[in-house]
Amino acid sequence: MRGNIHVKTNIIVFAFKGQLDAFSEKQFKNFITNNLKNEFSFVIDLTKIDFLDSSGLGALVQTAKECKKLKLGFSVVGNSRVAQTIKLVRLGDFLNLKSSLEDALNYLKN
C-alpha cells in the first residue's frame, strides 16, 4: 500500500493505492496518526484500493473514532468494491462514506 497527501481548501486528502488489509494496517495507521496533529478535517480516498479486509475496516473505524474524539471532520471515498464492503457491514454512515472526492469535500465544508 502506498499513500500520498494533498490539501484542498483546508481539508487534507489522503489517497491510498494497493490493499488495505492485515499486512498494511499498521502502515495505514502510522500514516494517519502522524498527520492527525494538523487539526484539519480530512478525507481518506480509497478509490485506488484493490482490496479491503476486516483489518482494514477496523483501521478505518479506529480512525473515525479518533477523529470524533479530536472533533475533526472525516469522510471516506471508495470505489465500488470498497463501498460495497463498507456497506455490507453497515459502516457507511459511521465512516461518512461518499461516492466521490467532490461529495466528500462538500460534506466536510458544511
Where are these regions (language model features)?
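STAS-typified acidic loop motif
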Residues: 2-30
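Short acidic-hydrophobic, aromatic-tinged amphipathic segments that line or gate anion-handling sites
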Residues: 96-100
